Design a protein with these regions (language model features):
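Signature of the first transmembrane helix
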Residues: 7-72, 101-105, 170-171, 230-260, ...
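Alpha-helical transmembrane segments of multi-pass membrane transport and lipid-handling proteins
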Residues: 88-115, 176, 201, 306-358
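Membrane-interface junctions at transmembrane-helix termini in multi-pass inner-membrane proteins
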Residues: 138-163, 175, 186, 207, ...
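Hydrophobic alpha-helical transmembrane segments
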Residues: 18, 160-210, 230-231
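Helix-loop junctions and terminal segments of transmembrane helices
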Residues: 60-76, 152, 211-212, 268, ...
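Interhelical loop/hinge segments that connect adjacent transmembrane helices in multipass membrane
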Residues: 1-8, 185-189, 203-246, 289, ...
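Alpha-helical transmembrane segments of polytopic membrane transporters and translocases
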Residues: 43-59, 88-92, 191, 198, ...
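Membrane-interface helix-capping segments at transmembrane helix termini in multi-pass transporters
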Residues: 2, 6, 39-45, 77-87, ...
Length: 379
């Protein structure tokens, strides 16, 4: 138990180093991107990217399932069979990426061009952004098993370094955006897709080099696939609810109020994502130990991790959220050159929601570890 606590502390520190670096650059790049694109184009990118993200209802459940099963197999020790599970997960995610591509290029394309609300002169740019967003999304879907393996093996140093490379490339994007004379919205979407492909290759090469269990033999194992899909069937309910809540609201706001309101909500979520990094990185360090403790039959140790994780997650987020909740207009004006209307109310609402959600993060992981997710997802 003591050794596990030290490992969690070490991994948390590594992830916090990653987070502080990425948060500082992300907040700066958000400011420059908003100023360079303008409120309307920034809102267009957020709503189109969010619309593509709605297809994560298909892949989102598999993400948590992959992380759970790889951690579980490692926790079983010599009895575990990580190699066949990893190969099966890769094949499943490639298949899911294909489904997303078909749906996005048919139903998605129709809905984007006939039901959503964009300025008439920006529909060409909107469609380019849509295509590049699909590429980015599918690449990220295929990357899931590789990311899950790095987290399950608790190689947080690698995870931190790759994230720093990613955010540095995004800083370069901002520079290219400022000096470029082409359509900046299209260029921004293209460069983000290029970064996604680059990071996917880095994760793949790392896993092949350092994890002998992460070499694909391209043989689908029905037993692992059936087990994962059984787990996912109930998780799908939670994914539908989550995606509908987050991205459905974005689409409704666009249809009734236009892209400028999407920009306000997008800024609020930029701040939320930065603050959530404190909680997510802490829970990311704890999650593999929770699953491994359950797999090893150490339930008392697992419960202790769940209780402590829930308490510390809430307190950490509260510590950083409280000043922003109190002084929201002042902080936004200090950060941005031009603050979109309604950003203050959006930011306060998402922070209050995040504080409530932070209590359940490690609890969800314990449910995933046990495999008994039906009742939780129904609630």
């Amino acid at each position: 138990m003591q050794q596990n606590n030290k490992r969690i502390a070490k991994n948390t520190l590594l992830l916090y180093f990653r987070m502080l670096f990425t948060m500082a650059i992300s907040l700066y790049t958000s400011r420059v991107v908003l100023a360079t694109l303008g409120i309307e184009d920034f809102g267009i990118y957020n709503v189109v990217g969010g619309f593509v993200a709605m297809f994560s209802v298909i892949s989102g459940s598999m993400t948590s399932a992959t992380q759970r099963f790889i951690s579980y197999e490692i926790g079983k020790g010599e009895e575990g069979n990580v190699s066949t599970l990893f190969t099966t997960a890769v094949i499943i995610h490639i298949f899911l990426g294909g489904i997303v591509l078909i749906l996005a290029e048919t139903i998605g394309l129709w809905f984007l061009n006939t039901q959503m609300n964009f300025p008439e002169n920006r529909y060409v740019a909107v469609n380019w952004v849509f295509q590049f967003s699909i590429i980015t999304f599918i690449v990220n879907v295929i990357s899931v098993p590789y990311n899950a393996a790095i987290i399950a093996y608790e190689r947080m140093k690698a995870f931190a370094y790759v994230s720093i490379i990613e955010v540095t490339l995004k800083l370069l994007i901002v520079y290219l955006l400022v000096i470029s004379s082409v359509d900046k919205l299209i260029l921004y979407a293209f460069l983000l897709a290029l970064v996604a492909v680059t990071i996917r290759l880095v994760y793949g090469l790392y896993c092949k080099r350092y994890f002998t269990d992460c070499h694909c033999n391209w043989i689908y194992h029905k037993s692992h696939g059936a087990e994962m899909f059984s787990f996912v069937s109930w998780n799908l309910i939670g994914s539908v609810a989550s995606v509908t809540k987050e991205q459905g609201i974005n689409i409704v706001l666009n249809i009734f109020f236009g892209a400028s309101v999407n920009a306000a909500r997008g800024i609020a979520y930029q701040v939320l994502n930065a603050l959530n990094g404190f909680v997510n990185n802490f829970q990311l360090a704890m999650n593999p130990q929770i699953v491994k403790s359950y797999a090893a039959g150490e339930k008392e140790a697992m419960f202790q991790l769940v209780y402590k994780g829930s308490k510390f997650s809430y307190l950490m987020l509260l510590l950083f959220s409280l000043p922003i909740l109190i002084e929201t207009p002042f902080i936004l004006n200090l950060w941005l050159e031009e603050v979109p209307q309604y950003t203050t109310i959006f930011l306060r609402l998402v922070l209050i929601t995040a504080l409530i959600d932070s209590l359940s993060g490690t609890l969800i992981t314990s449910m995933h570890a046990s495999g008994r997710v039906r009742n939780y997802q129904l609630i």
